[in-house]
Regions:
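Extended, charge-rich helix/loop segments that form flexible
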Residues: 22-113
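Homeobox/homeodomain signature
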Residues: 19, 91-92, 97, 106-108, ...
């Protein structure tokens, strides 16, 4: 479809995913919930049993566990808890990664299309704001180096994992600039203005993900009206 309309696109690659070793923890959580009618989990000092016997109950369980995992203080905490859930309910995270993510050969095929730009997306899809400055910088640099080695071309663009205010802020914007990325995108909703030229590693995006969206709403989203209200009519949200 994009080729038909001569529309360029950028694909941001987390290098562990292309190597088949990534942790798609949110997808693993879906797989855990899909294969059981109830989930036993220890959250803090409380042992919980969550109903997962109906589609609605599964969605509620996913929302509860997803929010808990995202709120854990460190990446190692999240990894520990999702690994325990996967072990208890027989989900192989690496097999999920290999089946769902592009391999390096597939990334190379995609990158050969002149409409396609490949950007970096860290090594492990880590929440950079929860990492030390050293680790966050390394996640950016190593991801970029691995992609450049695989594709034999420079990688100039970056996308922050998760990309919201809890995952990317002023420190991360500065790290991306220091790493030499020409642009870096968040998931903060917003349109592009001339003022964004001074904040090229803190760019907003308009999310067309199908959630609460249909063809009638698309003109509103692309007009900038919705994101203007979201941002309190500020053109730049780079702090």
């Amino acid at each position: 479809m994009l080729r038909e309309f001569d529309a360029p696109l950028t694909v941001y690659v987390a290098s562990d995913f292309a190597e088949g070793a990534g942790r798609l923890w949110w997808t693993a959580l879906e797989a855990v919930i899909a294969r059981t009618d109830q989930i036993d989990v220890q959250i803090g000092h409380s042992a919980l049993r969550l109903d997962a016997s109906t589609p609605a109950a599964k969605q509620a369980a996913f929302d509860r566990l997803h929010d808990w995992l995202r709120a854990l203080p460190g990446e190692h905490d999240l990894n520990r808890e999702i690994e325990a859930l996967c072990t208890n309910y027989g989900v192989d995270m690496e097999a999920l990664c290999r089946s769902l993510c592009l391999s390096w050969d597939e990334v190379k095929t995609l990158a050969a299309d002149p409409l396609v730009t490949i950007g970096a997306h860290t090594v492990s899809h880590s929440n950079l704001a929860k990492q030390t400055e050293e680790i966050a910088a390394r996640e950016m640099a190593v991801s970029r180096a691995r992609i450049e080695q695989a594709l034999e071309r420079p990688v100039l663009h970056f996308a922050y994992p998760y990309g919201d205010r809890d995952a990317a802020g002023e420190r991360e914007f500065a790290l991306a600039a220091a790493a030499g990325f020409k642009t870096a995108v968040t998931t903060r909703p917003g349109m592009l203005f001339a003022e964004n030229a001074g904040h090229m590693t803190a760019l907003p995006r308009v999310s067309l993900n199908g959630n609460y969206q249909d063809a009638r709403i698309l003109p509103v989203l692309t007009s900038g009206a919705a994101t203007a209200m979201w941002n309190g009519f500020r053109r730049i949200a780079a702090a």
